[in-house]
Each structure stands twice: as C-alpha cells, then as structure tokens.
Amino acid sequence: MSKQQPLERLAAADVITSLRSELEQTHSNPADVEREMRTRIEALHWEIFNQTQAEVTKRWTYEQGIKRPYYHVTELDEEQLTNWGKYLDSEEAEGDYERTKFLYERCLVTAANYDEIWFRYARWLASQNGKHEEVRNVYQRASCIYIPIAKPAIRLYYANFEESQGRFDVAVAIHEAILMHIPSHLETIRSLVNLHRRQYGVDAAIDILRKFTEDANCTPQTRGALVAEWARILWRSRDDSTGARKLFESTQNQFLDSQPFWSSWLLFEIDQPSNQSEESTAHERIKAVHQLIRHKSTLAPELVKILSSQYTRYLEERGGKDAMSELLKLDAELNGPASIQNAVKA
C-alpha cells in the first residue's frame, strides 16, 4: 500500500529532501531516484519498527505488573511497589532523562502517598546537573499536597535541601511548621537545633534547646533527650565536658524516667578521654552514674539491664585489676535468681 502513496506522506519533508539530494548525485533517471527513495524509506520505517518493538519488549514485563494505574487513597500491595522500583531501576539504567522523569511522574500518579517514592525521585533529580528547581518542586509537592505532616521525614529533607541552597529562613520555617502540629517531635527539634548550630553558632543552638526544654508542650521524654543533646553540644562543640556534666547533675531529678537522658549521661562519662593515671577517677564517675540509674532512676527493669550491659562492657574493656570482681557481682545482682535480686533491693 505504501508503494501507492506519494513520497510526501511516507516520510518527513527534511528526510525526503536529504534522500533526494543524495540520490540525485548518483542516479540520473528520476524513476530510479524515486524507486531507491521508497526502498530507503521502507528500510527506515522497518528500523523504527524494530527499535520500537525492542523498547516495548524491555518494558512489557513491568507494564504488566501495573495493576492500578490511577491514584487512590488505599494502599498499594507490596508486589506493585516492588514492580515500580524495578521499572525505575531499568529506566534509570537506560540513561534517558526525559523518559526516566516521565516514568517517575507516572509512578507518582499511583504511589503519591508513599514518601519513599518522593525521596527516590528527589535524589535522582539531585544527581542530574542543574536540576535544583525540579528538586525543590518535588519536595514542595510531596510536603504540601500528598504526604501528611504526621510523617515529617520528607519535610526535614526539604529543609536540608533549602539550607544547602542558602535559604536558611525557609529551612527554619519548615521546621517550625512541623512543630506547630507535632510539638514534641524529637527528630525535628534536633534538626532545628543543628541547623542553628551550623548557620548561627553554638549559642543560637543552645537558645533553641533551652526554649524547648522549658516548653510545657514537650513531653518529659523529649525534654530529657534535649537536655542530653544540650550536654552533647557543650562537650563536642565547646569542649566543655565540665559544663555538660553539671547540666546532667543539675537536671537529673526532672528526668528520672527518661531513658535518653540516663543513656546519654552514662555514654558521656564512658566516652570521656582518659589516660592510665586518670582511669580510676573516670571509673568512679561512670560507676556513680550507673548507681544512679539502678537506685535512683525510675526506669523499667529491662532498660536498667540494657544500660547496665554498657557499664559491664566498660568494665571488661577498660576496667582495672578489680573489674572482674565488680562485673561478676553486678551480673549476679542483675541476672541471678530472684533471691539475690530481692536481697539487693532490700
């Protein structure tokens, strides 16, 4: 049927012009020129067909796995999410930016409620040169439309992105928006504190910590963890281990049931650098904190055992000549029969 069609309907004008110009240099008969042009155009269409068929075949397995190509609030099953992941892997391996981006957008029609897809899309775009606005657009769509604020991880990454672009005020505003809805979200508060530390200095970070440790909207567990973070910044950023220790000591009565507080205090003392001559003093400090955990804190027995295991590890790895005696006595008190444990409590 194509043999009966005019050449102008078989190929684009620029293709016809190029072929005609080439063939007229080697063929003097117009009929020969047209016959050869038709042969080459047919070969061109056959090549396009084969390429298209090959591309379709590569993707057909993944396309068959797409059972729900539209948006719905109900969850996708794990099989479909896995299929989308493999499909994206395959398309990324091809290296075609436009095709890969188009597939991500198709995937989001179905899986817009899954922050892992938005994370993947943003990270892939960030790996492309000069795509900062596209990355920002992805984070904004995820944060403002699809992912509920009760799942703040994507918003925190959005804040990190804006900070990396020098928009510190926007990054701060994103954190504050999260905390308006989730006042005690520890990860967000820590992220905000470290943002201030990086951009405005240690004093600014401590001001944020002080604000939230005094905030009645924060739970005791969160405030205990923030005091531990405060001590960590004093030690790590100011090299003020004495100030950090005083902070722990002065606030201990407020956080008797805060596992992050006691765990951080114990690890703080264990991690203090000391030489052989100072190890005895360090041991006494570590032992004192451990005794507070066992006899003063109101932590659950299971948590006390976990923290005690850190102390026994310290005794084993850094303890002195009498460390094994103390370790075995402590092990019996913590893990021995009820008669021993009850005697210790009495």
Residue ranges and their predicted role:
Residues 1-346:
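Polyampholytic low-complexity alpha-helical segments
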